[in-house]
Amino acid sequence: MAYRIGFGIDFHQLVEGRPFWLGGVNINHYKGALGHSDADVLLHAICDALLGAACLGDIGIHFPNTAEEYKNIDSKILLQKTWELIAAKQYTVVNIDTTVCLEAPKIMAHALKMRINIADVLHINIDDVSIKATTTEKMGFAGREEGLVAYATVLLERK
């Protein structure tokens, strides 16, 4: 058995007038992440971690923010396409550990639905998906509620 670890990170600016998508869940908030797609930082960080673990580059290579086909795309579709790429290399996901850093909104009430979304797309058990949240104690861009960041670590196993 061959195991591979991947790490992903994604940042997005928060702006008024955009929906707030996280882990495939639309969370009610007066700001949303600015981006070419739906700007779901959590799913983007997971995509990057999966691609990195499989030595397949990064999300920008496969889903460039200059391609019209990805404009406002649901990031669950990007995660599905990422899963197809790693599955083609005979990898399965062992587990995922994530952290989202933001001041608001509070997200943990939505974590179960996010875990279900991620597990469903990646064909894994919900108990293999961890989502945590933290703040920067009001420091930096996240602390000023100008943006947010998500971190993801994944473990892959070759079939």
Positions of the model-derived regions?
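SAM-dependent methyltransferases
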Residues: 1-2, 159
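Short acidic capping loops at alpha-helix termini that bridge into adjacent secondary structure
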Residues: 125-128
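Pyridoxal 5′-phosphate
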Residues: 131-135
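C-terminal edge-of-domain segments
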Residues: 142-159
